[in-house]
């Protein structure tokens, strides 16, 4: 489901922490050449803090709080910050409770950008039914973040 995938990637790429497990991999998968250089530990910690806050805001269903982690210039294919805003509104209308668990598998830096590879899952309790349902899970998916005014924000692939 496109709606949930974008929101999950939003939370995954920029936040690391509340329910995240420790950094899983320091080396790329065998045979896979990843862009950039290994990310310094200080930057990993900054990304973890940003992720923790984004997850907290997502689970609180705080649209503005989640979107504060997305660059105004965000673009991945046709997906923009405005589209993410609409997707959040749909999710917040469908579910009365949301949970996200995200682990940053690896992060690579290239200039002011960080390629963040994450694994995670999102579940929600359907409004009016009270039923918990898995919404999305992903493994080692990339997202691009960049530092804007001293804060890490999702930036997208800019295609």
Sequence positions of predicted segments:
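N-terminal secretory signal peptides that target proteins for export/translocation
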Residues: 1-5
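Bacterial N-terminal signal peptides
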Residues: 8-21
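Short, low-complexity N-terminal intrinsically disordered segments enriched in polar/charged residues
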Residues: 24-60, 68, 77, 103-105
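Short beta-strand edge/turn micro-motifs at domain boundaries
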Residues: 26-38, 115, 134-159
């Amino acid at each position: 489901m496109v709606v949930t995938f974008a929101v999950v990637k939003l939370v995954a790429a920029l936040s690391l922490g509340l329910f995240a497990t420790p950094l899983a991999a320091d080396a790329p998968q065998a045979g896979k050449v990843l862009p950039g250089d290994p990310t310094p530990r200080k930057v990993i910690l900054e990304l973890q803090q940003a992720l923790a806050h984004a997850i907290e805001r997502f689970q609180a269903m705080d649209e503005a709080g989640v979107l504060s982690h997305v660059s105004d210039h965000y673009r991945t294919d046709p997906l923009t910050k405005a589209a993410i805003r609409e997707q959040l509104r749909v999710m917040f209308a469908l579910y009365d409770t949301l949970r996200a668990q995200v682990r940053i598998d690896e992060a690579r830096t290239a200039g002011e950008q960080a390629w963040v590879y994450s694994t995670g899952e999102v579940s929600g309790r359907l409004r009016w039914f009270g039923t918990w349902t898995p919404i999305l899970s992903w493994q080692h998916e990339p997202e691009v973040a960049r530092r804007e005014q001293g804060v890490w924000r999702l930036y997208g692939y800019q295609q």
